[in-house]
Regions:
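Intrinsically disordered, low-complexity basic tails/linkers immediately adjacent to helix-turn-helix/homeobox/MYB/SANT
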Residues: 75-85
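Short recognition helix of helix-turn-helix/winged-helix DNA-binding domains
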Residues: 1-66, 72-77
Length: 85
């Protein structure tokens, strides 16, 4: 089963979570990693920031992505690193 079929067959995922997963999958490098900010994801998919955050949480909870915090040299946060599993 392809990743596309697997995502669409999973009834635990909302439409917004599927859209965000496809967005991340499309932007991931060869190792499955990408780092768009929530604001960028929301803008590109025409979602509210909160809806994008909920979709990311749903994907992490169901094991479709892994989310790791990233930090600048001064210790402030920047966009998360997402790994598409």
């Amino acid at each position: 089963m392809s990743w596309y079929e697997r995502v669409y067959a999973d009834e635990r995922l909302s439409h917004r979570a599927r859209a965000v997963y496809m967005y991340l999958h499309d932007r991931a490098d060869a190792e499955g990693k990408c780092w768009p900010g929530v604001k960028r994801i929301a803008a590109d998919l025409h979602l509210s920031r909160r809806t994008a955050q909920r979709a990311l949480s749903d994907l992490e909870r169901t094991g479709y992505i892994k989310r790791d915090g990233r930090y600048r040299e001064n210790g402030s946060r920047t966009s998360n690193l997402y790994t598409v599993v």
